């Protein structure tokens, strides 16, 4: 009984710890940021994830097909065939979430690091030209209404996203004597995240085991004190019978 109590307590402590076998997911980082480029643009994907000592190999997948084992994956001149889903994995990480690459054909492309923003986040839109040709008289539009004009090619910056920034955006500018427009991109602004119990989800697999251990601990403790009372009562009964025997003539 004395040995059972400490072992149960140790099991309770161990059950609260995350499993050491769970590996973090690798993360794909793209340069330039976002997932929209024009043909002949260069793109670099970097895989963030731990590797065993002395082993720096990385698995790169394009649409599910293994394409490289280098630390990073470089596309020198993008083509439409490079569009698709990219994932990576290192020696001490799980396969990353997919990152989409869209390779577009055109003179201008509206680039954004993401299409869904939370309220309060900054928004940066860039009017990118094919082969980085100079662009003049750049205009940015939201829902076909002009929002910004510049003689040079400067970005459209919104310090804090609000609901009125939802909409369809595109840019227009002069490349030489050509008046070109980009395709439209839908920008979505979401409200602030609602607090929830999702942070507890990683620990749900451990909760049933912890509950069982707690019940065992309670039962063991109850048995221990019940045994102590039983021994104490037995000892008192034995002492009383001994005293009564000495008083006989």
From Swiss-Prot:
Residues 220-249 are cytoplasmic. SMART domains: IG (SM00409), IGc2 (SM00408). The record marks 220 as: Important for receptor turnover. One of its GO terms (biological process) is antibody-dependent cellular cytotoxicity. The chain crosses the membrane at residues 199-219. Disulfide bonds join 47-88, 127-171. It is found in: Cell membrane. One of its GO terms (molecular function) is IgG binding. Residues 17-198 are extracellular. The keyword Lipid biosynthesis does not apply. Glycans are attached at residues 55, 63, 166, 179. Pfam families: Ig_2. InterPro entries: Ig-like_dom, Ig-like_dom_sf, Ig-like_fold, Ig_Fc_receptor, Ig_sub, Ig_sub2. It is a single-pass membrane protein. GO terms for cellular component: external side of plasma membrane. SUPFAM superfamilies: Immunoglobulin (SSF48726). Residues 1-16 form the signal peptide. Receptor for the invariable Fc fragment of immunoglobulin gamma (IgG). Optimally activated upon binding of clustered antigen-IgG complexes displayed on cell surfaces, triggers lysis of antibody-coated cells, a process known as antibody-dependent cellular cytotoxicity (ADCC). Does not bind free monomeric IgG, thus avoiding inappropriate effector cell activation in the absence of antigenic trigger. Mediates IgG effector functions on natural killer (NK) cells. Forms a heterooligomeric complex with ITAM-containing signaling subunits FCER1G. Interacts (via transmembrane domain) with signaling subunits; this interaction is a prerequisite for receptor complex expression on the cell surface and intracellular signal transduction. Binds the Fc region of antigen-complexed IgG. This is Low affinity immunoglobulin gamma Fc region receptor III-A.
